[in-house]
Swiss-Prot record:
InterPro entries: aa-tRNA-synth_I_cd-bd, aa-tRNA-synth_I_codon-bd_sub2, aa-tRNA-synth_I_CS, aa_tRNA-synth_I_cd-bd_sf, Glu-tRNA-ligase_bac/mito, Glu/Gln-tRNA-synth, Glu/Gln-tRNA-synth_Ib_cat-dom, GluQ/Sye. Belongs to the class-I aminoacyl-tRNA synthetase family. Glutamate--tRNA ligase type 1 subfamily. ATP binds at K241. A motif ('HIGH' region) lies at residues 10-20. It comes from the Bacteria. Catalyzes the attachment of glutamate to tRNA(Glu) in a two-step reaction: glutamate is first activated by ATP to form Glu-AMP and then transferred to the acceptor end of tRNA(Glu). NCBIfam families: gltX_bact (TIGR00464). It comes from Proteus mirabilis (strain HI4320). This is Glutamate--tRNA ligase.
Length: 472
């Protein structure tokens, strides 16, 4: 058996969205599972809509997801000479022909067909001769599609699919301006690049019989095809570049880990028993095209969030820290005076479902705050909190070995000494050192903030209570 070779071939007319990312992932996994090769190809024949920022966004998305490619990126715009060479060979061989029909004639033909309730299609007017035209007159080149029989291909996901050749008109393969068309470029690329399996969205099913006929006319091998069903949004509507689809890099910006998004995307249409959590190695080991569902998959943001929380807490903290660092920089936080990012992940991992949330909620570990959160201060920084704060401050000041255990002991001893519940000490202390009413466990929080900073903040809270008393 020849080496398996797949490709991901996005059009750079927008960012890489989740549908494209899932297609790329499936193609990548299939090649890796079979120890084959994965090709990245940029289908930029739409010269008006293809942009360099979109190409950059695709590359950024692929790199962030760690979907590495073995060949490419290839650009179709750099291969126009090759496409035109093949078209000229087809003209000479009689498998393509020049069409001189005017735009007006084709529009009238379309209107007449639609008025009769017929499917609009080219009527083959120029199929059997040039009708006294010369090659230097404006024309397109059409593929001479077979008029009898049918095209049958065995879709690796959907099973046998058949199209009658009578339903397929003669496809334009070169425009009037001399540029080759998308459907033709794809065929030549897959042939030249020796692609064995084409894995793509179900919106390409209708292109497949036309592409197979061109390959057969060229005497080229026909690859296997697998058409993946669409993804529906949380609202049940189709995700597309132009509607409701979120860029892969937006998920990065929103604080998701690539491991979480990959795990989510692989399960969005593919399954292996009832397993939900997959490492990359497990995906590669277990992935098959036959296990992909024919049905549309519904995107569920809550499930992605659950997976992200899982990976924040189960991946090595050092690995998560690499991604968290980007979000910390977005918040302009200097982490040199506070816990390391690895420590921060261990502190906040259980509480935070995204890295963005973690970066936004960690400021008090590194930066002194100007004011207390109003509701928390009103409830917990009252005159009754003065004594617990003063006693716990003095006990914290006396600690020579600054550990979370000794911090906990100081809080506990304060409660016992004053004969009050832990909450009567803990909540005022929490608001004093963090500025708010919520944080990880108080002993590890105070320990991470540091001795000098914690004591200074307790003193600030005591001043706040004094000011409050004076204003009463």
């Amino acid at each position: 058996m020849s080496k398996i070779k797949t490709r991901f071939a996005p059009s750079p007319t927008g960012y890489l969205h989740v549908g494209g990312a899932r297609t790329a992932l499936y193609s990548w996994l299939f090649s890796r599972h079979n120890k084959g090769e994965f090709v990245l190809r940029i289908e930029d024949t739409d010269l008006e809509r293809s942009t360099q920022p979109a190409i950059d966004a695709i590359m950024d998305g692929m790199n962030w997801l760690n979907l590495n490619w073995d060949e490419g990126p290839y650009y179709q715009t750099k291969r126009f000479d090759r496409y035109n060479q093949v078209i000229d060979q087809m003209l000479a061989a009689g498998t393509a022909y020049r069409c001189y029909c005017s735009k007006e004639r084709l529009e009238k033909l379309r209107e007449d067909q639609m008025a009769k309730g017929e499917k609009p299609r080219y009527d083959g007017c120029c199929r059997h001769g040039d009708h006294n035209h010369t090659p230097d007159e404006p024309h397109v080149v059409r593929f001479l599609n077979p008029q009898e029989g049918s095209v049958i291909f065995n879709d690796k996901i959907r099973g046998p699919i058949e199209f009658s050749n009578q339903e397929l008109d003669d496809l334009i393969i070169r425009r009037t301006d001399g540029s080759p068309t998308y459907n033709f470029c794809v065929v030549i690329d897959d042939w030249d690049m020796e692609i064995t399996h084409v894995i793509r969205g179900e919106d390409h099913i209708n292109n497949t019989p036309r592409q197979i006929n061109i390959l057969k006319a060229l005497g080229a091998p026909v690859p296997e095809y697998a058409h993946v069903s669409m993804i529906l949004g949380d609202d049940g509507k189709k995700l597309s570049k132009r509607y409701n689809a979120v860029s892969v890099m937006q998920y990065r910006d929103d604080g998701y880990l690539p491991e979480a998004l990959l795990n989510y995307l692989v399960r969005l249409g593919w399954s292996h028993g009832d397993q939900e959590i997959f490492s990359i190695d497990e995906m590669i080991k277990d992935f098959t095209l036959e296990a992909i569902s024919k049905s549309a998959s519904a995107f569920n943001t809550d499930k992605l969030l659950w997976l992200n929380h899982h990976y924040i807490n189960t991946l090595p903290a050092e690995q998560v820290a690499v991604h968290l660092d980007w979000h910390i920089k977005q918040q302009n936080i200097d982490t040199s005076n506070g816990p390391s990012l690895v420590e921060l992940i261990k502190l906040l991992g259980e509480r935070c479902k995204t890295l963005k949330e973690m970066a936004e909620s960690c400021h008090y570990f590194y930066v002194d705050f100007d004011s207390f959160e109003e509701t928390a201060a009103k409830k917990h920084l009252r005159p009754v909190a003065r004594q617990p704060l003063e006693v716990v401050r003095d006990k914290l000041s006396a600690i020579t070995d600054w550990t979370a255990e000794n911090v906990h002991k100081a809080i506990q001893e304060t409660a016992e000494e004053l004969e009050v519940g832990m909450g009567k000490v803990g909540m005022p202390l929490r608001v004093a050192v963090t500025g708010a009413g919520q944080s990880p466990a108080l002993d590890v929080t105070v320990h991470a903030i540091g001795k000098a900073r914690s004591i200074a903040r307790i003193n600030k809270a005591l001043d706040f209570i004094t000011d409050r008393e004076n204003q009463a």
